[in-house]
Amino acid sequence: MARFPEAEERLLNKKICMKCNARNAIRATRCRKCGYGTLRVKSKESKGA
């Protein structure tokens, strides 16, 4: 993935809103853009085969 563990932490340690796909802080409970309550953790693995 990323070259450095620091970069990987910064890029992948996020939550994604299930409604508007906004990136949120890992400690967020609601979306910062739309206020939606359902957030998922960003995938650590790429979707490609």
From Swiss-Prot:
What name does this protein carry? Large ribosomal subunit protein eL40
Question: What NCBIfam families would the database entry show?
Answer: PRK04136.1 (NF003161)
Q: Name the family the entry cites.
A: Belongs to the eukaryotic ribosomal protein eL40 family.
The keyword Methyltransferase is annotated on this UniProt entry: no
Q: Which species expresses this protein natively?
A: Methanosarcina acetivorans (strain ATCC 35395 / DSM 2834 / JCM 12185 / C2A)
* SUPFAM superfamilies linked: Zn-binding ribosomal proteins
Under the heading InterPro entries, the entry gives: Ribosomal_eL40_arc (IPR023657), Ribosomal_eL40_dom (IPR001975), Ribosomal_eL40_sf (IPR038587), Ribosomal_zn-bd (IPR011332)
HAMAP family assigned: Ribosomal_eL40
